[in-house]
Swiss-Prot record:
Complex and partners: Homodimer.
Transmembrane segments: none
Family: Belongs to the YbaB/EbfC family.
Name of the protein in question: Nucleoid-associated protein CYB_2894
InterPro entries membership: YbaB-like_sf, YbaB/EbfC
Subcellular location: Cytoplasm, Nucleoid
One Pfam family hit: YbaB_DNA_bd
Keywords: Cytoplasm, DNA-binding
HAMAP family from the UniProt entry: DNA_YbaB_EbfC
Main function: Binds to DNA and alters its conformation. May be involved in regulation of gene expression, nucleoid organization and DNA protection.
Major localisation: cytoplasm
Keyword DNA-binding: yes
GO molecular function, one term: DNA binding
Length: 111
């Protein structure tokens, strides 16, 4: 704890914690970009892979699914995409909570 600086010490401490969060956010951003999260539909016949930022990376179709109607294939693709997006968004939310969950900014009424 910084002593002898009154409110300036609290501000300095808050700035240090803000820098820690920023550094952690940069690490998290890189980690999210490198993640691969797979959403599936049709018991794995259709797979959509996204990264931790919900950016699509790959679509995989089992040849068996191509025997289905266009409507069925579209529904399976949409289901797999939503599944992948949901998992990715939840992963991002949890990781952000881990990053910011223990942050308190003393004297600023924010933590």
């Amino acid at each position: 704890m910084t002593r002898g600086f009154g409110p300036f010490g609290k501000i300095q401490e808050a700035l240090k914690k803000a820098q820690e969060v920023r550094d952690g956010a940069q690490r998290l951003q890189k980690e999210l970009e490198e993640m691969e999260i797979v959403g599936e539909a049709g018991n794995g016949l259709v797979k959509v892979t996204v990264n931790g930022n919900q950016e699509p990376l790959k679509v995989s179709l089992d040849p068996q699914v191509l025997q289905e109607s266009v409507d069925v294939v579209e529904d399976l693709l949409l289901t797999a995409m939503v599944n992948a997006y949901t998992q990715s968004a939840e992963t991002m939310r949890k990781r952000m909570e881990e990053l910011t969950g223990n942050i308190s900014l003393p004297g600023l009424g924010l933590g």
